[in-house]
Amino acid sequence: MKFTLLVVGRTIEKHYITAINDYVERTRHFISFDMEVIPELKNTKNLSMEQQKEKEGELILKALLPGDVVVLLDEHGKEFRSVEFANWIERKMHTVNKRLVFIIGGPYGFAPKIYDAAQEKISLSKMTFSHQMIRLIFVEQLYRAMTILNNGPYHHE
């Protein structure tokens, strides 16, 4: 089984890049994990929000493989405490055969076809975060889940 974080647009700020890469590497000690970047759309000034979401949606769908289990990071998704998320991840590790793909959409969210392609939605908070920051929050929580499942010293209850 492989874990993939699919994001729209590259991470820009250096301090986020450094921290994200650190947690990605730490997480790889436990699981097969990678982060794939879908390039940002260019020349979007003449596109409506809906058109932009549709175009991003087409690129997201092209990045998915048959058999992927798709989980959207979405403000309307299920919320977990860290231990609950770790338990959810553990269940997925026993039931997903190919890739578990977490997707962070563009600035306007997801096109309807992406919601249709997803099996689940999870929310990392009721608060709103930048798309740059949420990447770091997610990879930190995935790493935390791995340390919880492996009785590591990182997480404290």
List PLM regions with ranges.
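N-terminal beta1-alpha1 ligand-phosphate binding loop
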Residues: M1-T27
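Proline/glycine-rich low-complexity loops and linkers
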Residues: G105-G106, A117
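Loop/turn-to-beta-strand initiation segments
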Residues: K2, K98-F102
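General small-molecule cofactor/ligand-binding pocket signal
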Residues: L6, D34-E36
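Structured adenosyl-cofactor binding patch, chiefly the S-adenosyl-L-methionine
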Residues: P112-H156
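Short glycine-rich anion-binding loops that position phosphate/pyrophosphate groups of nucleotides
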Residues: T11, E75-K78, G106-G109
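Conserved strand-to-helix beginnings and helix N-cap segments that scaffold or border functional pockets
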Residues: I17-I20, S82-A86, Y115, R135
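S-adenosyl-L-methionine/SAH cofactor-binding core of RNA-modifying enzymes
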Residues: S32, P39-K98
